[in-house]
Amino acid sequence: MPLIYKICPAALWREAEAAGQFLGAPVDLADGYIHFSTAAQVRETAARHFAGTDDLVLAAVDAEALGSALRYEPSRGGDLFPHLYGPLPLSAVRSVVPLPLAEDGRHRFPATLDA
């Protein structure tokens, strides 16, 4: 089961849990798809797009559970990133953990991300 990751403000994730699905953050809605990262990409995503931001969560999602709505597409830099064209069903989410800032200002990822 390959996992992909979504970094999200905790308050927005709580709204998704109440609604039963995640429709996306403002940037996702503007772009027309939900942005995800692979395990190899998620730290750079956090540093580039969430630097210094606290009160985030990291959702691990079963990529296979998303079917054909999930596409791997090139970013501006050429790397292939997972994009979901449609809402994220919470049934595909395998875990949600806090993504706190460490003392050095970078996000502290769970050890299981490297497992």
Language model regions located:
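Conserved, structured core segments of small domains
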Residues: 1-115
